[in-house]
UniProtKB/Swiss-Prot annotation:
Transmembrane segment boundaries: none
GO cellular component: cytoplasm
Cofactor: a divalent metal cation
E.C. designation(s): 3.6.1.9
HAMAP family registered for this protein in UniProt: Maf (MF_00528)
Designated name of the protein: Nucleoside triphosphate pyrophosphatase
Intracellular or extracellular location(s): Cytoplasm
Main location: cytoplasm
Molecular-function GO terms, alphabetical: nucleoside triphosphate diphosphatase activity
Domain of life: Bacteria
Length: 189
C-alpha cells in the first residue's frame, strides 16, 4: 500500500492524477534548515524525514511504501519557505519581483527493510515586476500563506510568472512525471 506523508491538499490532488490508490498520513515535521546546509540538501533531508516518520507510523501495514516531499523556493542561495505572517509574505514577493528563482522539490520513497529512493527536481521560475499594489492585493487574498515563497502557481500567483523552465507540478509541490517514474522504478527493483 502506498502512503503519502503530507498535510498538503495540493500534493494529495496531484498524486490522485497518477491513478494509484494511496492513503494519507497527516504529520508535521519541523522544517528547519541547518546552518551551512545547502538548499538542495535541505529539501532532500526534509522529504526523507517525512517519508521515514510516515513509515514508522504504518510499520504494521502490509508492504507499506511511504512517499514524502518537500518544496522550497530559492533565490540567490536564500531559502524561502512558508511565510510566518503577511509582512513576511509581502517581503518574499517583493524579493522575487522581476527576478528568476529556483523551486526545488524533493520526493522520497521508503519501504520496510530500509529500501529507499529519491529524486530532486529543480525548476526555474521568472517573475514579472510586481507593483506594491499587486503584492498587497495578493497578500490580502490570503493565498500566500502556507506556500513556499509566498505564492501558489496554480492559483492567483500564476499571473506573476513570466517564464517557467521545468516542472509545473513540481512547482506546485509534487513533480508528477518524476514521481511516476520513481514509483515505477521502485516497483521494479
Amino acid at each position: 500500500m502506498l502512503y503519502l506523508a503530507s498535510r498538503s491538499l495540493c500534493r494529495r490532488q496531484l498524486l490522485q492524477r497518477l491513478d494509484i490508490p494511496f492513503q494519507v498520513i497527516d504529520l508535521e515535521i519541523p522544517e528547519v534548515r541547518r546552518e551551512d546546509e545547502l538548499p538542495q540538501d535541505y529539501v532532500r533531508r526534509v522529504a526523507q524525514e517525512k517519508a521515514q516518520v510516515g513509515l514508522a507510523r504504518v510499520r504494521d501495514a502490509f508492504a507499506p511504501k511511504v512517499l514524502g516531499a518537500d518544496t522550497e523556493v530559492v533565490l540567490d542561495g536564500r531559502v524561502f519557505g512558508k511565510p510566518a505572517d503577511l509582512v513576511e509574505a509581502a517581503a518574499m514577493l517583493a524579493a522575487l519581483s522581476g527576478r528568476t528563482h529556483q523551486v526545488m522539490t524533493a520526493v522520497s520513497l521508503v519501504a520496510a527493510g530500509g529500501v529507499a529512493a529519491q529524486v530532486l527536481v529543480v525548476s526555474e521560475v521568472s517573475f514579472a515586476l510586481l507593483s506594491q499594489g499587486q503584492i498587497a492585493r495578493y497578500v490580502d487574498s490570503g493565498e500566500p500563506m502556507g506556500k513556499a515563497g509566498a505564492y501558489a502557481i496554480q492559483g492567483r500567483g500564476e499571473c506573476f510568472v513570466s517564464r517557467l523552465v521545468g516542472s509545473y507540478s513540481g512547482v506546485m509541490g509534487l513533480p508528477l512525471q518524476q514521481t511516476a517514474q520513481l514509483l515505477t522504478t521502485f516497483e521494479e527493483s
